[in-house]
Amino acid sequence: MNVGKKTAAAIILLIVVLAGWILIRTFNAKAWPKHKASALAALPPAALTHLSTAISIPTVSPQDPSRIDSATFLKYRSFLESAYPMIHQRLSRDIVADFSYVYTWKGADSSLAPLILMAHYDVVPVEPSALSLWTAKPFGGEIKGDTIFGRGSVDDKCSMIAIMETVESLLRRNFTPRRTVLLCFGHNEESTGQGAVAIVHLLQQRNIRAEMVVDEGGELTREKLGDLQRPVALIGIGEKGYATFELLVEKTGGHSSRPDKETAIDILSRALYKLRGEQTPRRILDPTREFLTRISGSSSDFPRKMALNNLWLFEGYVLYKMGEDKDGRAMISTTIVPTILESGIRENVIPSQARAIVNSRILPGESIKEIQEFIRKAVDDPRVKIRITGDFSTEPSPMTDYHSHVFKKVADAASDVEDDVIPVPYVMVGATDSRNYRAISNGVVNFCPITDGKGYHGIDERLPIKDFQRAIQFYTLLIQ
């Protein structure tokens, strides 16, 4: 009995000590330091008009490069030339792959590696069936109150026009940067991305290695982490991989009045159901752990604050909670989802083939080959043929060091355009042109101070004018 009592007492003491340690760590957690941002400068003259005009030119990049609307892209080039005369007088311009551009602004110290500011100006199309759901013309560039509407307002003409406005304004003040600044603009990021590939090839031919590359992708968010009651700067330091797989079933069809027990559609449907039921492994990556650590002291949700400040004990719980939300799930696991289904030619014909396209965004530490094998095991049916397809696939990218001066410079600039920002490293769940630039720089980051971008790739894409102001100030800080 004495031994039992001693054991029970020891267990109780251990629980009390453990609980005390957890509570001490929780209550002692320090919030990220607050910082008052500088006042936003007034927009340059005609800046809003220029953004509106840019949006009104429908630079849609088709999946088939041969079907590009050259006249529209040439119109956009003419717009840039007329809107930004100082840039076209003082900077050299290379036209790459027909419609991508590299502007070179020589710095005072040629020994310094250049800064690359990049964006893309092509956009995705607007679904005809969704036109009636828009409250403004998709390519109208209409300003309503404090917001500008239109395809590309967020993704990604805001970035491009903000960069151009920044440089044009600095040129008018006779400013010369210390290091050379390259402005790199792709014209088909939303399709093949070959413009960016060609730009990087050109820079490699010139033996250029960049100190820093800043592209779209990361943003300011208030809505996604509402319990913080502070804005968070999601600064992209790397990207998940990207791969598309075809699942194909071939089986003799026939007349719909005499169906077999199983058809090609049945087999494929069951395969997709099984695939969606299998969860890829969940892991907290090192940058994601740093992300959670930085926000942990500012949470107003006590259970969440306790869990985040004691990941050594609650990591499983945090993984579970993050997995309940689509944004959180994308941060901790490879995602696999069907995006296209094809089968059948008539209502009274049983098809002999059923095909699905499945898109995957691959967590760093995993590979395309491993995900293909995961799909094969999940489906577990040799009648379903699985292969990689699509015009583009890439393994997860290397990561930029979030302790580097490059990350700090972007974090400091983000903190100077919005009050009380918490800058965090973020593994991008989408693919951008910047992945190509890792061949010429170890300092690739993804960020533009847009706040919870609305409607991009969807309905009523729109940008608060204040975000446009922030973007111009952000790029000015990076250059200066």
Task: Enumerate the predicted regions with their spans.
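A common structural junction motif
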Residues: 121-122, 275-280, 376-385
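N-terminal Sec-pathway targeting helices
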Residues: 1-16
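Short amphipathic alpha-helices in soluble, non-transmembrane regions
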Residues: 262-263, 371-379
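Acidic/His- and Gly-rich active-site-bordering loop/insert found
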Residues: 14-151, 170-177
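Acidic/histidine-rich catalytic neighborhood of metal-dependent amide-processing enzymes
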Residues: 147-234
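Short, solvent-exposed loop/turn and secondary-structure capping segments
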Residues: 65-66, 126-131, 194-196, 224-227, ...
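Midchain, well-structured core segments that form catalytic/ion-binding scaffolds
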Residues: 197, 205-369
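An extended, acidic, His-containing surface patch that forms the Zn2+-binding/catalytic region
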Residues: 93-95, 102-104, 108-112, 221-222, ...
